[in-house]
């Protein structure tokens, strides 16, 4: 091997071999450890028994056997995990830690057993849903306890049963006399919390096997015992020693649940990890549905007249996640029995809870056929499972806490309120996903689950759009937005990349060459007059001007300066924005309370956006003002494209020479996107110019500069004449960008530029923000291509079918939303573990991630 080693005999004992192999004492060991890998002491012992010399080496230990005929290095990935010692306090003994940092703590206590079923049934909080449906829940049983649960189910005449363990944390079972009881690894800093999300891509089952092997190895180092804890609040008498003898001294979850089922083929076990907070992932719903699909007695088959199978859900305490599983199972049983009358009769005292006060629930009822009925069905299912935990009441309780939040100190305000708001959001999001699952059952249960839950959701993108409204946790009260918001003066000078403030009194004013399409930043009343005079002068002679205002924020002009409400709040319809601006104006015009001169208003003159334009309509008779709020950074919504095209077509039908002006805060992102939409629409209405040959681009990664991202080309391949459709969009982007080169690259370049910035930055929060931006820009580019395809394909029918309808009826079936649900840069990195690649998280961030802003005057 080329490795020089001494042949002098070196004694290596079991107690010291680990330090020798690891290259130092435990105190000097590297703090990093592999969750998936565990050091194999038995393998090391085997080598020790044969070894004449073991020489530490930077690559791996070099082992020379006694007969000097064999020399080898141990290239075992498992040896990279360090054995570490630790203790909970100075009064407790030191012992080995699993995975290098965790203590094993018994996770079931008598306090958890609220229903007192541990002794009588074998598991804590064992119960059945009200109404007699065969849906059960329980806490974590021991091995013998689980056998007693099975006996009870069989005694009750249940011939078929599906057992779901819904725990997502690793659990190991250690011998206690003739039984095996559960323990979970916990961090010293959070001894009351189970280990969650150990590492991306690491499954709890694999982690359990690694810990199982570790405990075997630790026991061999410490006289066949290992130290565990029963009470981390009172360390007197802790830790306890558990004898570990042989391979069967430690069991994992699958062994405890599957071994008793070996001789009962009609009883099946599945691991279905569910989160402790918030809703399950689509993949977790898919896993649940796949089990249902494999259960003929649960499917709507013609010859299926047998008894229903039992569904048994188990988590640690049998409350939170178990309750969620029971609600899911109850909804499935509803659809199998086609009636909920038995449950209505079972809970006559369950008072209806006002869930419709939440904007996202209102949106669901409005968008979904029989939406109100589906909400009522979910409420009945929750009530049937509410013996220990009521999910509806949890939503309302969290909302009440949020409304009555009073921090103990100013310094505590931000963190505490954020924690309360996060809990409120999680509970509402969970309730919303139960509604989605019930809607899924309505459509897919009669079809025996032809589509998985995740694929079905991609056929209903309007439901993903509702996620944006989830951030409005409480009822939408305009007065609350005003009371809790602040008024920010718009910064219109530093944004002036095109240096047009000096000439036009407004930032980034520009025109599309050879077309009456203009873009600008937020104008003041004075700047608006200058622009209208410019457009109607002797050179341009525009008789009709349509001004399309794109801001989603509440905007007022106060004493000659534009201001906006911060934070901007949830997305509102144009009419609601107008009403809220009027309400804010009235609020600002009222006397300031608690002042010596109560009649003094905050501003001398205050105008809404509508009033600013109305003042100029007298001087410019051809001016038409249109409010089409569009989200910043990301792609316009499908309905936004509808409104833009409708405004453009109506104006051009009236006067083909109409000029269009688009404006947002900076005159950049939203304005540029709307200008491209206008260019494409005008081309298709008046005739598209010939798109020239593709120019050669001599720069590194030229395909990105040309917009040839892998996901974009995937969309292009689905569209008729897709490459030409993309070329037209690229031509529109180029023509709009001709006069704005100093502002930045055009959209195709800014996608990859922002992606590289995200990879280069070292600050985690900034990296995530830039990653989101790059994906939003990429999605915006794809939507422009889809909109252009719509313009081409629907031209013969004069676009009678709106773009939103076309996306739902055509693009959805083509799989466009499934592509958008895996958005990213697979040619540069894996997108498997990136939540923002999925619609669920990316669209929800539209209202959760406003750009940072300095604090202004509180209202």
From Swiss-Prot:
Protein name: Paladin
Principal location class: cytoplasm
Tissues and organs where the protein is expressed, per its UniProt entry: Vascular expression detected in the central nervous system, kidney, lung, heart, skeletal muscle, white adipose tissue (WAT), brown adipose tissue, liver, pancreas and spleen. Not expressed in all vessels: for instance, not expressed in capillaries in the brain, and expressed mainly in large vessels in the heart, WAT, liver, pancreas and kidney. Predominant nonvascular expression in myocardium and lung mesenchyme. In large vessels, primarily expressed by smooth muscle cells, but occasionally detected at low levels in the endothelium. Expressed in various cells of the hematopoietic lineage.
Highest taxon listed in the record's lineage: Eukaryota
This protein's GO CC annotations: cytosol
Transmembrane segments: none
Cited Gene3D superfamilies: Protein tyrosine phosphatase superfamily
Pfam families for this protein: PTPlike_phytase (PF14566)
Modified residues (Phosphoserine): 89
Lipidation (N-myristoyl glycine): 2
Subcellular location: Cytoplasm, Cytosol
Record lineage: Eukaryota, Metazoa, Chordata, Craniata, Vertebrata
Sequence similarity: Belongs to the paladin family.
Span list, region Disordered: 1-34
Keyword annotations: Cytoplasm, Lipoprotein, Myristate, Phosphoprotein
